[in-house]
Amino acid sequence: MDELIMMVFVLFTIVLLLTVSMTLAALISTIVVLVVPLIICIIALLIALRIKYGSKKDLSEVSIGFFHPYCTAGGGGERVLWCAIKSIQEEYPYVRCVVYTGDKESDDEIFNKVKKTFDIELGRDNLEFIRLKKRKWVEASTYPRFTLIGQSLGSMILGWEALTKFVPTIFLDSMGYAFTFPIFSLIGGSTVACYVHYPTISSDMISSVKSSSYSFNNDVSISSNKFKTISKLIYYNIFSKIYQIVGSFSKLVMVNGTWTGNHIRDIWKKQFGYDLFIVYPPVDVKGRKQLKLGWMDGTRKNMILSIAQFRPEKNHQLQLRTLAHLLEKYPSHREQPLNTKLVLVGGVRDQADRDRVEQLRNLSKELNIEDHVEFQIGISSDQLNQLLSEASVGIHTMYNEHFGIGVVELMAAGVIPVANNSAGPKEDIVRHEDTGFLASTIQEYAEYIHEILAYREKYVEMQKKARDSTDRFSESNFSNQFLKYIKPLINQSLRNNNSSSKKRN
């Protein structure tokens, strides 16, 4: 009887395995029947599009298409764009530069704004602007949810529009739209390069979600909900893999600093010194260094200066709480001769930013420090220079800021920085206790600020060292480094064009 039961069980198992195998085989066959033709169609479509748009590339010239949809924004990213173009114009006057932009200003208005904002005089003979009408697809406001993937897919729509209007020899993305890379590489046949200010996604972002930590890109509604946390973690990991794939299409990657470089190396699997290079962004070091040092002659006031847009990640609350702690622990800062003041300088983009400023004003009242706090919104360059010439301490509180142009400007102007002990300021800009200070907590910030203001004579040398250390962030240094790494691509393009011309002849 036992043998019969065993035989029935074995036969049942065999039948079950055969049934499962046949089902799987049928499923695989169905997938093959459906997927293989689809893959063939996609490949055929790519080849057809490559023939159509690749043939539009003018082989009689070398052109560089700069993908920068917001070229008139007037920030650090735009200084990178215009300095890069200026460098190309001076070194390769015969190379055609094209800027893909969604801005509606006329050419003259853009040229004039670049001159007024950055004091950069661009040549007009070999620079043109191609207007893009689909910029709304990369605006964060278009995607209240799934912003990362939404903007990334949206950039492909914008990139397609750009490709259909002009196919460059070299495509250079300078705003972080990596999903445009395969479009220009596979279909346009362009050599892809990029300048990365910060990775679209990083291991820090994933770790923040994994640990359920609250941050500006991981709000309480997600960090406090396990299901949402797991869902977002899956979303981030999938996006990270796709980001790695599109990043592989770039033959040259320039990054603004060590922190960004390390993350891009890990995500895109690039190699420092081979296809990944650090090129510090250009900062108006020359202009800031013209300001008088005036450390001991009374020119510098007991002013703490903050330069940062009023965005949540800039963490202005920490600055106010630092001042409150300073005034509480060292009451002498409330009175003459110290009478220490915090001046917050920054721009506002929208109503949310304006509301944030109002919240900060209310916080200063709650902390009983409103008489020692001043807000300067959207001030002129001359007004900023005046503040830079009067301030003694600069405060920077953003965690993991990819670089920190504001910190460099402070140092060049003769303002001793107390910056956040993370990312760009820590790895590339401030040498702790040599050219400034690095802090993480309210207590650390307050102690360093007190030390600088109360014992001013000890920091004469630090002020000079801080200013001298900013030479590596000058426009001329950026130009030299940028040309060093873009030259091989331009020279290779010239050789390819010459070879194609000979074949046609």
UniProtKB/Swiss-Prot annotation:
Pathway: Protein modification; protein glycosylation
Subcellular location: Endoplasmic reticulum membrane
Bilayer-crossing regions: 4-24
Keywords: Endoplasmic reticulum, Glycosyltransferase, Membrane, Transferase, Transmembrane, Transmembrane helix
Cytoplasmic face residues: 25-145, 167-402, 424-505
The keyword rRNA-binding belongs to this UniProt entry's keyword annotation: no
Keyword Translocase: no
A Pfam family assignment: Glycos_transf_1
Lumenal side, ranges: 1-3
Intramembrane segments: 146-166, 403-423
Membrane topology per record: Single-pass membrane protein
Role of this protein: GDP-Man:Man(3)GlcNAc(2)-PP-Dol alpha-1,2-mannosyltransferase that operates in the biosynthetic pathway of dolichol-linked oligosaccharides, the glycan precursors employed in protein asparagine (N)-glycosylation. The assembly of dolichol-linked oligosaccharides begins on the cytosolic side of the endoplasmic reticulum membrane and finishes in its lumen. The sequential addition of sugars to dolichol pyrophosphate produces dolichol-linked oligosaccharides containing fourteen sugars, including two GlcNAcs, nine mannoses and three glucoses.
Protein name per UniProt: GDP-Man:Man(3)GlcNAc(2)-PP-Dol alpha-1,2-mannosyltransferase
Protein's organism: Dictyostelium discoideum
Gene this chain is encoded by: alg11
